[in-house]
Amino acid sequence: MCAVQGFWHQACTATVSLPSKTLADNDPATIQAVGAAGTGASYWAVGDKIGIAVNGTFGGLTLNQTVYAFILGFNHNQSVEGNGIDFQFGKTADGRDIAFVQSYGSTGTGFCMNTTNTNSGGWKNSHMMKTICPAFLNALPAAWRNAIKNCTKYSDNSGGGSDNASYVTATTQKIFLLAEFEVHGTRYYANSAERNYQKQYDYYKNGNSKVKYQHSSTGSACIWWLRSVYATNAAYFCRVYTDGGAYSNIAYFSIGFAPGFKAA
């Protein structure tokens, strides 16, 4: 203790624990706090990955293994979506890009956008958003479920084959698919108004590969779903092809599932 102007003062010390600059060495609560503060880029880089134990059944796939989520961007589309660290599944431990597959190439089952061949109702009313994505969230550890923010995303939520700007509205969800513009940075098949509310993710803007491989057969490239409807077709949603290009696919086809989330 020391006396200052006649008063005795007790010296106090406090220990402050800073996040590790190695993403994988941090727990979900730390990543959440950094995301909420908007300071993720001070510690980590786009493309950094962290292993997450996925244990559950979603889209008919029962899985119990560690899959790596990687950083898509920091404070992505901040004026619409707020602070956070956006991630996508997935990668293998050695960094190979993968998507989940189940009954790959079949119809009406597995990772289909809808169980019948229609895009009516768009993203908001799709089987993918209403059933598969929540089931995937439930397959994540509780600590990660708590770290994931309800995220606002704009999409065509009507479908039906008309490129109508009024069809693009907001939804909130913890697990989402990426949109065509968020991956490619341009519009090919999606509603032409989606891009007015979206930004391309830095991970893809930086030139990283859009090709993904089947989680169960990592030598086999797979087509993977996007949440954007094919605006001028009543039965298709957008997808990324095995060469990384922009294409579309019938809604009840089972292809790759590569979900995203925001930690904040």
Regions found by a protein language model. Name each.
Residues 2, 7-264:
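Collagenous Gly-X-Y triple-helix signature in extracellular proteins
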